[in-house]
């Protein structure tokens, strides 16, 4: 029998391995919590298990692991730009040096981190980091030459700048939707964020890349719009759960400040895209999925 929360559509030996220990995991996790409650709140310790059994309270991922893990994590991608994932996986020799290696290493990073938590891994700087490598390959103001050919005369497949960016999108999306052995054959839960101009200025106005350059709003805006449009079209053809998207906007009490992004948000919902919207009166907070 498969756990209703297991996110699997068919049984195989990989997800069976994950399911078979869930009863034991649940007993261990529940006893750990009861032991702690007996120390902190002995008067309610006995009630804890009764309330769980009667679905009055809920404990997240109680059966997924016998050890205590945090639920979700949001991570900065800056160490990825400067060090790569070698300090985690012990294999990758250096930081990413082009668009393709960045797409590979960010996928590896998400898999590595997801094995150390029960929930999601949020990479809110995905488009900021991606732009760093787009600029490295295609130069400043790459967004003005999206339809320029960017492959050598010796290449049989001719690709434009736009094609290469879409290729990076595909590598990232196909990667994070792959089943993971360490997650009982589930994909690693992955979150990304889109920012309106107000959010971008507040969060990244003073941000510098490792080479001292700064991200341009027009470049980030172009990447975000390209990804949203492309991802929505791909989802019409196949089920792709990840990344889960959050669209962040700032309001002034009367309306969204960045009216262009208010319009984009409405357009994407009208086109059937599925994403979360987070609206705040200040860019000092951020939501990813939850």
What would you call each of these model-derived segments?
Residues 2-290:
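Conserved catalytic cores of very large enzyme subunits
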